A protein has these predicted regions:
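Extracytoplasmic copper-binding redox domains, predominantly the cupredoxin/blue-copper superfamily
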Residues: 2-108
Length: 108
């Protein structure tokens, strides 16, 4: 590999590492059959950790175009995380408790 190839590869590695360093983790708790907040703004690459503080299970999901996911059922003290890789609005709900709703705005 020539010097340009090495420099290019090094720059690519640095960009990947920089993206990982700047990504943030946000924590949303579930307690009293409700999310701790109604709206959250995150950036592309950020992760949201959903922490269950209720004495029963939740099943957090989204069918949104910007991010579709289903975390499955998880109990008290457990958490599951989602990383957002595309800008847009993500409507989050609980399959067990239909009144639980959260909007996540993912920005660039």
């Amino acid at each position: 590999m020539n010097r340009r190839g090495i420099a290019g590869a090094s720059a690519a590695v640095l960009l990947v590492l920089a993206g990982a360093v700047w990504a943030a983790e946000h924590v949303v708790t579930q307690k009293g059959k409700a999310f701790s907040i109604k709206k959250l703004v995150v950036k592309v690459g950020d992760t949201v950790k959903f922490l269950n503080e209720d004495p029963f299970s939740h099943n957090i999901f989204s069918l949104s175009d910007a991010k579709s996911f289903d975390l499955g059922s998880y109990g008290q003290g457990q958490s599951k995380s989602v990383t957002f890789d595309k800008a847009g609005l993500v409507e989050v709900e609980c399959a067990v408790h239909p009144d639980m709703k959260l909007v996540i705005e993912v920005t660039k």
